[in-house]
């Protein structure tokens, strides 16, 4: 049993992925546009071209998608396998084989994993 599955079984973690899957079923272009607008507002910018964007605990992948559409190189990670699947499904739907968006399994509590991420311009969590 994986660490994630063991922690779910012991009641130490909540499975967010199923909720994100339902959210993606109702995702509209308006919600994607709102995510883009909110990122620009929060960061005080018009776009993210040339920026490296890290989505910590990517969940549905909505803000990874928003950053990608704003021109960033995106790196998304989550500990929950179902959340990773949701983020990957969103990437597949909107960007297919574009290497500007990487998705991986990882934990914000794993110092070794974090050390391998390299230089980042924007961290979103």
Name each region found by the language model.
Residues 124:
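A conserved beta-strand element that flanks and buttresses the S-adenosyl-L-methionine
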Residues 1-54, 60-118:
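Conserved N-terminal segment of class I S-adenosyl-L-methionine
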